[in-house]
């Protein structure tokens, strides 16, 4: 089948592999992106593929943490241009939307647009704001994390709202959680920077681990390693995969001698108790939204002829 320049571009962005290697892998995979990534990794050409992150839209991520640090809200509001995203009216709108979501019990954007705000339905409120600002604006998504019993939440915004994170921990005692509040903000900053795919090893689907074993075995076979040696090496490869892709296994950005789990454990112990991270949500502005092809795609097309 014909492989487009846009497909080659995306595969290059996700794997770091060369243009012709990407083209061949896509042809071998009949255009299936995930299969092409697997082919490149088995050949040892690609690193672990980045999540498809064709960031496109403008706007902002906003985070709100309740005064008692028991609930955190994260929301993405999109605009058509970055110019409007920097507009004070847009910023005020985002603040209002964020507060409204934090105080309501809505669970979906569809529900949100039917709720009352300032004596009108939210959908009508947004239409009026769009008319005032002069550009289409949409609440794309939102999430909340709330804790019951001994627990604490916090959040972090990176790059002026390009990335946002909320994270929660549970503790054996409330005073332990209170002592971890600031550390949890640092953990949220770590999540923004390191983008862990999973919370811990138990969160990784079994099929993902099996696929990593397959890829590791194919790489080692290519290097000429015998089967009995491959069998001994693979557990170490999987251990490294877990450490690099889970929040608790990653080295903490503010102290790379320790994992995030070690940092939390030690801080909780110093406060006279125990604690564990129970969940996190990370948003990156526009992730997953297709964007208009840039000139680079045309450049790739010219080189493929």
Curated annotation (Swiss-Prot):
Q: Which InterPro entries match?
A: EF-Ts_dimer_sf, Transl_elong_EFTs/EF1B, Transl_elong_EFTs/EF1B_dimer, Transl_elong_Ts_CS, UBA-like_sf
Protein keywords: Cytoplasm, Elongation factor, Protein biosynthesis
Q: Which Pfam families match?
A: EF_TS
- Mind telling me which residue stretches traverse the membrane in this protein? none
Locations listed in the record: Cytoplasm
Region described as Involved in Mg(2+) ion dislocation from EF-Tu: 81-84
SUPFAM superfamilies hit by this protein:
Elongation factor Ts (EF-Ts), dimerisation domain, UBA-like
Q: Which GO terms describe its cellular component?
A: cytoplasm
Q: Which domain of life is it from?
A: Bacteria
Question: Has keyword NADP?
Answer: no
Q: Which GO terms describe its molecular function?
A: translation elongation factor activity
Q: What does this protein do?
A: Associates with the EF-Tu.GDP complex and induces the exchange of GDP to GTP. It remains bound to the aminoacyl-tRNA.EF-Tu.GTP complex up to the GTP hydrolysis stage on the ribosome.
| Family, per entry | Belongs to the EF-Ts family.
PANTHER family referenced in this protein's UniProt entry, alphabetically: ELONGATION FACTOR TS (PTHR11741), ELONGATION FACTOR TS, MITOCHONDRIAL (PTHR11741:SF0)
The protein in question is named Elongation factor Ts
The taxonomic lineage of its organism, from the top, reads: Bacteria, Pseudomonadati, Campylobacterota, Epsilonproteobacteria, Nautiliales
């Amino acid at each position: 089948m014909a492989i487009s320049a846009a497909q080659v571009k995306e595969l290059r962005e996700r794997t770091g592999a060369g243009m012709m290697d990407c083209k061949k892998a896509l042809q071998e995979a009949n255009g299936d992106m995930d299969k092409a990534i697997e082919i490149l990794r088995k050949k040892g050409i690609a690193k672990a593929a980045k999540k498809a992150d064709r960031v496109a839209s403008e706007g902002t991520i906003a985070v709100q943490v309740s005064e008692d640090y028991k609930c955190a809200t994260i929301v993405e509001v999109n605009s058509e241009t970055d110019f409007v995203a920097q507009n004070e009216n847009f910023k005020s709108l985002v603040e209002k939307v964020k507060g409204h979501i934090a105080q309501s019990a809505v669970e979906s954007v569809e529900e949100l647009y039917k709720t009352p705000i300032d004596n009108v339905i939210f959908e009508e409120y947004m239409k009026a704001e769009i008319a005032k600002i002069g550009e289409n604006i949409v609440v794309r998504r939102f999430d909340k994390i709330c804790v019951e019993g001994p627990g604490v939440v916090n959040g972090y915004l990176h790059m002026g709202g390009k990335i946002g994170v909320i994270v929660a921990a549970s503790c054996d005692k409330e005073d332990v959680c209170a002592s971890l509040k600031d550390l949890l903000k640092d953990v949220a900053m770590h999540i923004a920077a390191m983008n862990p795919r999973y919370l811990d090893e138990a969160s990784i689907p079994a099929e993902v681990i099996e696929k990593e074993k397959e890829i590791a075995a194919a790489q080692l076979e290519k290097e000429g390693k015998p089967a009995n040696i491959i069998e001994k090496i693979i557990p170490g490869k999987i251990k490294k995969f877990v450490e690099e892709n889970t929040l608790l296994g990653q080295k903490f950005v503010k102290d790379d001698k320790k994992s995030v789990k070690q940092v939390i454990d030690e801080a909780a112990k110093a406060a006279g108790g125990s604690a564990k991270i129970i969940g996190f949500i990370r948003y990156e502005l526009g992730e997953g939204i297709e964007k208009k092809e840039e000139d680079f795609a045309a450049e790739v097309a010219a080189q493929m002829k």
